[in-house]
Structures are given as C-alpha cells and as structure tokens.
Amino acid sequence: MAGLESAPAARPSLTSISSGELRSLWTCDCELALLPLGQLLRLQPGAFQLRGDQLVVPAPAEPASARGGFNVFGDGFVRLDGQLYRLSSYMRRYVELTNYCDYKDYRETILSKPMLFFVHVQTKKDSLKERTYAFLVNTRHPKIRRQIEQGMDMVISSVIGESYRLQFDFQEVVKNFFPPGNKVVNGEDLSFAYEFKADALFDFFYWFGLSNSTVKVNGKVLNLSSTSPEKKETIKLFLEKMSEPLIRRSSFSDRKFSVTSRGSIDEVFNCNLSPRSSLMEPLVAELPFPCVLESEETPNPFI
C-alpha cells in the first residue's frame, strides 16, 4: 500500500500543486514530507542553526523549543554538503524504559512535535555524491498519529506485565518516494524503537525475542523541494504551522487527537498558514527525559 501511495506519478509535490492550492492545504493534510536539509535550515533558522561544526537544535529547556520545532532523531552526527556536523541536541533512536512514568513521558514526548530524520541519498546522476534530506513525520496528522498510538496500545495489550521491544519503521515509505536509480544509503536510520523492561521473574517471550514488534508506518509523502521564492515562502509558513506548539490537555484521553474535538489542538489544523500571532497561550510542558534527549550538556547514560 505504501508503494502505491508513494509512486512517483502520484507523489504530491510543489511542481504539481500550485502556490494557491498549497496555501489552502490544512497542516493535517501533510502526513509525511521530504525536502533538502539545507533548504530546511534556511527556512527554519529558529529551529536549526549551524555553528561551526555543530548543528544546533534547541533543547527542551531553551526558549526556542517552547515555540515549537521538531523532535530530531539521530545518532549524534549528520553530513551536509560533504561536511560532518555534530548534533547539539537530539532524541536517541533507541531507548530503554523501566516504568510506566517513563513510558508515559516518552509517549507524550514523541507525539508532542513533528519528527525529523536525516536521509542520505545517492542520486542516479552521481552515485559518488550523497544528498542529505530531511524526512518529516507529522505526528498531528490523524493517520500518522493513529498508527503510532495503536502500535503502542496493541503491544501493551498483548504483553501485559512482560518486557517487550517496539520499533517504528519508515524505510519502505521513504524508499518508495524516490524514483528508481536513487539509493537511500542510511535506511536503517529511518526508524526509532523503545524497549520496556518489566520486573518479571520469568520473561520467556522476551528472552527468546518473541515479544519484539515492528510497525511499518505508511503515508503519503509530500515533496517540499522548490527553487521558487514564492513557493519557498509558502513552504516556510507551512513548516511553521506544522511545528507550532501543542497545548497540553488535562488528561491523557483529552490529549489524544480527535477530528471531532474542539479547542486549541484543532487550531493546528485550520487553513490559515500564517504563524501563530500570539504565544501567550499555555504551551506544551517540555518533559525532562534524559534517557531520550541527547545533548552535549547532558551525559549519555547508555554509552
């Protein structure tokens, strides 16, 4: 199904969608998106900054993070235009959880912002040169959010009181996006996983690897690459709307996305692509989760 939705002929792009049509799109109409990393850095200077040999991403405690942004998944480094940069702050693609509070914080954290993964591609024209793309996962789109939430809910219901490992994989949908002849070099990096270790005396299924699950996330990929100044401005507003802060609700059930719910969460999905005019509303409370977030100021307890 993912291959059919992401076939080159049907792939939504800025060459097939006019500027006016793109302005009328709801943010929730964008399930997944791809654009050159360099273009993303230029369009989102508040969310990403190149400082020397570092690609700086605002940490949860920094004011810029409270204004929105992305959950960047990586291994600490990213290559751009042949140069290797260190990530100053990012989320690890694999974490271990040992209690319900950690699980709850992790779940809320990964769903609080759009996800970003780095994609390295060898083109058909020049197989020796890699291009770096940013792959965006809109966790506020009902289709994407449903796949993540249902994956987490289903594995819990099947392994009550036992340890388990759950992985979310985007390799197939990304590889199907690019035309034949282009090679995704780092497909294994297009995933994230967590392992919940329960305090069970006999964890046979976990010991033998029978409680490992993988959810292959599928969706329609929007091509946000463009050289047109007008369309670049539209893309900028589009990205800002996608990454606006998500307001925390009073209970978990209230925070779950519903197309019929009313209130601030649905403001993210209106047709107005202008940036939020006021930041005086309560913003999502960032979660101090040291085993998830990597930064140069925070020691990594898993290395």
UniProtKB/Swiss-Prot annotation:
<keyword id="KW-0963">Cytoplasm</keyword>
<dbReference type="GO" id="GO:0005737">
    <property type="term" value="C:cytoplasm"/>
</dbReference>
<protein>
    <recommendedName>
        <fullName>Mesenteric estrogen-dependent adipogenesis protein</fullName>
    </recommendedName>
</protein>
<comment type="function">
    <text>Involved in processes that promote adipocyte differentiation, lipid accumulation, and glucose uptake in mature adipocytes.</text>
</comment>
<dbReference type="InterPro" id="IPR043460">
    <property type="entry name" value="MEDAG/TEX26"/>
</dbReference>
<dbReference type="GO" id="GO:0045600">
    <property type="term" value="P:positive regulation of fat cell differentiation"/>
</dbReference>
